Amino acid sequence: QLACRDRSRIALESDLLSAAMLGIDNILCLTGDHTKMGDHPQAKPVFDLDSVSLLHTVKLLESGVDLGGNELVGEPPKFSKGAVVSPCSDSVDAQLAKMERKVAAGAEYFQTQAVFEPEKFIKFMEKAKQFGKPVQVGIIIPKSAGMAKFMNNNVAGIHVPDEMLEELKADKEKTKAGITGVEIAARIIKECKPYCQGVHIMALGWESKIPDLDPDLCIRNRFCRDAKPRCLVRAFRQIQKL
């Protein structure tokens, strides 16, 4: 993930070229949330570029030229360029317009904001098919009703329905153990999988619960059981192939 919030265009180009040298070829281009939403609200945001212009920058580097018009030395980098979209946003048309601009700028795949309303996701995907780009549905395992309320109030593009809030409140011990959250997330995955090309799990510290979400996600490998970063990367590559 490469966010524009904290970096100038020079820093972003530097990070991209460094990533290429290290063999990192999958890039997710993000504008980034404003610093006021994080735990350092006094920090000054940069936003020299946004996600669309960052995608354009990546394409430019791939052609062998940087944003200053300088030719790169050696073989140009080659990336798999991703972007994000919020299918459950209040304005679907605005999200589709953003998606179109990102595709035009070079986006090859999309990851979505966390989905808690499968019916909205399915309707969005019916319209997003026109772009012909693979989409990975975003899944968060909700840890508590408080967490769900926080996301409703503070995270754009996310809405946890009232019935899910009540489900998280119903049995506090079950919720604390992660059972309720896994049940909710697994249900969402099951409903959304036929309409997308992958699943992006944002476990937020509950990586060990990933195998419980859907046997199809992890049964072909045992890496997720270890819940270690390197193993999870391999597991994610397996998920992408499903």
For the regions a language model picked out, list residue spans one by one.
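Hydrophobic faces of well-ordered beta-strands that scaffold small-molecule active sites
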Residues: 1-2, 27-29, 81-85, 110-112, ...
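Short, ordered loop/turn segments at secondary-structure junctions
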Residues: 3-5, 29-35, 114-115, 140-142, ...
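N-terminal low-complexity segments that are often proline-rich with Ser/Thr-Pro
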Residues: 221-242
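Active-site pocket-lining/capping segments in soluble small-molecule metabolic enzymes
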Residues: 32, 45-74, 84-89, 132-188, ...
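A generic, well-ordered mixed alpha/beta core segment in the N-terminal half of proteins
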Residues: 2-35
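Short, acidic/polar
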Residues: 10-16, 91-101, 182-189
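Active-site-adjacent beta->alpha loops and helix N-cap segments on the catalytic face
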Residues: 8-14, 34-54, 66, 92-93, ...
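Conserved, mostly hydrophobic/aromatic
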Residues: 19, 102, 106, 137, ...
